[in-house]
Amino acid sequence: DVSFSLSGSSSTSYSKFIGALRKALPSNGTVYNITLLLSSASGASRYTLMKLSNYDGKAITVAIDVTNVYIMGYLVNSTSYFFNESDAKLASQYVFAGSTIVTLPYSGNYEKLQTAAGKIREKIPLGFPALDSAITTLFHYDSTAAAAAFLVIIQTTAESSRFKYIEGQIIMRISKNGVPSLATISLENEWSALSKQIQLAQTNNGTFKTPVVIMDAGGQRVEIGNVGSKVVTKNIQLLLN
């Protein structure tokens, strides 16, 4: 289990936390030196916990599915909150034992969360101040702000663990929030496709069977077609199996 506290935090403590989160995910080996996540896991071994504390020291404990870094739910004191989906319902049988379970009115995917938040990710600022607010919102479970809070937490933890570029984007926003770059959104959307193509490239001389189009930092469309790309060699840290 891993933890991150905003109180006394720095770029170093955040990077250490993201590194610890990556290491907390069991691996099926590597593909082109990138960690390949497990294709499945059963029982309690399918989950790892992540404790997040705001500047005030208030903490939530988040349950993560180790096969895909998806957030299932979280615990505050003796109450747990889980997304309204079958995977999260299953998780509730193995984590936060003895807690009172509240089922949230939405599932944990971006589309559903954006609909509930009434905002797309492109419009929701990220950064340490945003993370502080998000933890506070979930700690008190403010239902009107919870969906947007999840969008902040997912990107600041899971997405940062998947992509070094996103980790760097959060670090740039330590003192001041900023909306995510187009490249950030694009990498988030294409993680599954990139994971698949990098694995297929093993038997295809390093070439993708189907190129993946992403936006670069300057907002230009870039076609990624092989494992020599910087996205593969320098950026992606985890592969969905």
Curated annotation (Swiss-Prot):
Gene3D superfamilies cross-referenced by the UniProt entry: Ricin (A subunit), domain 1, Ricin (A Subunit), domain 2
EC numbers on record: 3.2.2.22
Coiled coil: none
Entry superkingdom: Eukaryota
InterPro entries: Ribosome-inact_prot_sf, Ribosome_inactivat_1/2, Ribosome_inactivat_prot, Ribosome_inactivat_prot_CS, Ribosome_inactivat_prot_sub1, Ribosome_inactivat_prot_sub2
Catalytic residues of the enzyme: 159
Pfam hit, one: RIP
GO biological process: defense response; negative regulation of translation
Positions of transmembrane segments: none
Molecular functions (GO terms): rRNA N-glycosylase activity; toxin activity
Glycosylation sites: 28, 33, 77, 84, 205
Reaction(s) catalysed by this chain's protein: Endohydrolysis of the N-glycosidic bond at one specific adenosine on the 28S rRNA
Keywords for this protein: Glycoprotein, Hydrolase, Plant defense, Protein synthesis inhibitor, Toxin
Family of this protein: Belongs to the ribosome-inactivating protein family. Type 1 RIP subfamily.
Protein name listed in UniProt: Ribosome-inactivating protein luffaculin 1
